[in-house]
Amino acid sequence: LYPAGLCTINQREVGRDTRSFSSGLRAALREDPDVILVGEMRDLDTIQTALTAAETGHLVFATVHTQSAADAVDRIVDVFPGERQQQIRLQLSMTLRAVLSQQLLPRRDGPGRVPACEVMRVDGAIRNLIREGKTPQIRNAIQTTGAVGNILMERAVQNLFQGGAISRETMERALQGLPDAGPLAGGMKPRL
């Protein structure tokens, strides 16, 4: 935690400074912040307030526990009742800029972990898929659209193996937990 004073970071601790994530987020909006970091979006009120903050021009960073970028979109939408989900898809499609999904994998060369990151930068194609509720097609869009920097988790894991950062065993374990991971990089060799 950062102590108050001359810092440029103002924070609220749930339980000490505010009753809940959503009430702390609403209070923060009254202070006209440039950037908002929400530790975790777990409930409808917090997600709705974060979406509203993004719509009003704030840069909002938040975490959601999911396996992939497409799962993050579904998790956010599924928190809301059915009659509101189309509105939330529309809000999300207009405000979401990127999703980074990560796994921390054991390093091959010693202690510690290395992040494998799926990156989804939202372009026109992905924006339309979100708006139309076609999240199962997002995986394909990440792989084929022109957004620079997009990468699926399985490619990120394979790149770590090829770069020598993780072992074959670690790569295979990580790929087994992924949907549609395709063939397990049988012919791949690490570059050492």
Model feature map: region roles:
Residues 1-192:
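Short, flexible helix-loop junctions that flank or precede catalytic/ligand sites
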